[in-house]
């Protein structure tokens, strides 16, 4: 039963949120004021989560998908003991732990970075997917070592975003029963009344996806909210609870209007609102001891007991299933097996293979040595070569399966991979054609912001795709991905560079990786293994030519490296001194010392030609004003791939002509 103390706690959360925003003179008070009752009920009655014990693996995950309501989350984190009151007073200020939108690894208790609407909802699907897979893999009768819920607080905006449709469809199809979404349904958007833009039947929509739908008609009714969450936890499949709320509840002049969505109340309205709550407007950032005690005696007590029981269970699990327990402990540590690289393939000089196919060979080896390896493709597994051949598919019936069928849902796949990476216990990946990286670009950006160990496989990387034509031939995508800070964009030149690229991807604890791979075959370069290993990790290195300062530099990535080597050999026959540099990862190269960069691309050599079947954007930094770039300024064409490549000037003869014209 709920009582007056509970109502005091709810109103305290509202007041804290208001004061946090007023102090900053910036923020979104409407959602915290309307959604405080559902958040309070969830945290005090259901959530197994202690923000002071952030490394407890079996905790419930809470995601504020409506990240603009961050003041509510920070208020909850404060009353539950993990965020100092002073941090609320520094909301949205430089160096504070309370940024405008919640940030992963910045504030304890924040599971994923949210703000771009729809992505929190969709990353939550990834969190629930990770829980389901790990539970299927590790749980044994009487030993549910992975057993937690993912709770989401989502807004109208989240559900309008296209990604929510993709993610909800995937979650329903896979019966992710541990996913519970609380939908703050307040009928107001930033611009005004919601019905001017959004009138769909939420119940019919989600039931069509295979979700359970529950309705709480009064968002201030704590008992009904509690019952709905309890019901959701007992049902098969994911559940959405539509909670009808009033945005800015308690504000006499702004409640129920868009005026309270994204701007502070103002001092006069704050005073009237506090009086409506029965609180003293003269007291700012005020929390009574009894409110702290409620969270101490409910949420924190429950979470501590749950963690203690789990630790005891894990000890017994280790006694009964020692090998499985060791694998589980390694997985949740996020570390790789010490000798995981030993079984990775080495490709001999003379081997000819598409880097997507060589990647597929590497994937088979990784799956045997890295048990936490898990992912799939957006309906292109056969083309991406991304499936584990001897593994079962992931499904609601076989959650332990390794191959995820994401379907044609690229954006949701990207967000789900991010969610799995944030969850822990997995080294996740997703795959599609490179040209469709645009469909998940916002997820790639968020992955980089969060600093996740996530891998994205992009195949069919150039105009060499051929017959499918310009809609399927990437041009600007490479430059676009390279522009994302903290993103490893690796375009390997052969099978061995591909192997090392995968090593980088798996080992990059705080940087996501995009692997950009070919459809067409590439010859293995005649380069020693240790040189390739170091060179790919450093982003660029010499693969052919003079160790002394050369007359000419040929710079390239991916499939164009072997073409550059062919041209270099002809130049040498003409008595020219030339060096070929493979540049698979610009991001890594830029992090090297000036001494190393100078050793690879000597500043004294001004006769430089860069070769890449993509936009020239970015290459002029490396070729300088005296150099040339053989690239593509327009779109591709539909014809056999070899012919398209020739017509666009990616031939040995054109390279020689460009070099000799310098």
Curated annotation (Swiss-Prot):
EC number: 2.2.1.1
Protein name as it appears in the record: Transketolase
Assembly behavior: Homodimer.
Active-site residues from the entry: 410
Function: Catalyzes the transfer of a two-carbon ketol group from a ketose donor to an aldose acceptor, via a covalent intermediate with the cofactor thiamine pyrophosphate.
Biological source species: Staphylococcus aureus (strain MRSA252)
Superkingdom: Bacteria
Family: Belongs to the transketolase family.
Reaction catalysis annotation: D-sedoheptulose 7-phosphate + D-glyceraldehyde 3-phosphate = aldehydo-D-ribose 5-phosphate + D-xylulose 5-phosphate
